[in-house]
């Protein structure tokens, strides 16, 4: 469950290390973001020489959440951290690598490029 002011790890090589959620996109009453939701975020920690700088406002897709959630088959899944991947136009990732596992729900939400770059899909 990601809401405004939540800080997330960035799981790609764009140079951002940590972002803070500003808004969960998808209507005026959307309160929480789940895996596969797009958020608007601010870069809080960045490495020098990266694509993004501290203070940049970016769009990102949530790939892992620490809060468990149920799947249609009755199973539950949760991750150790809250993580996101920065995206650009046409919802393609801005980085060329993705670190750590991603949730299977991204495939259903048509983030195929992220799924193909990920080392593991759970």
Curated annotation (Swiss-Prot):
Pfam families: Ribosomal_L14. One of its GO terms (biological process) is translation. PROSITE patterns: RIBOSOMAL_L14. GO terms for cellular component: cytosolic large ribosomal subunit. Keywords: Ribonucleoprotein, Ribosomal protein, RNA-binding, rRNA-binding. InterPro entries: Ribosomal_uL14, Ribosomal_uL14_bac-type, Ribosomal_uL14_CS, Ribosomal_uL14_sf. The keyword Transcription does not apply. It comes from the Bacteria. HAMAP family: Ribosomal_uL14 (MF_01367). NCBIfam families: rplN_bact. Belongs to the universal ribosomal protein uL14 family. Part of the 50S ribosomal subunit. Forms a cluster with proteins L3 and L19. In the 70S ribosome, L14 and L19 interact and together make contacts with the 16S rRNA in bridges B5 and B8. Binds to 23S rRNA. Forms part of two intersubunit bridges in the 70S ribosome. This is Large ribosomal subunit protein uL14.
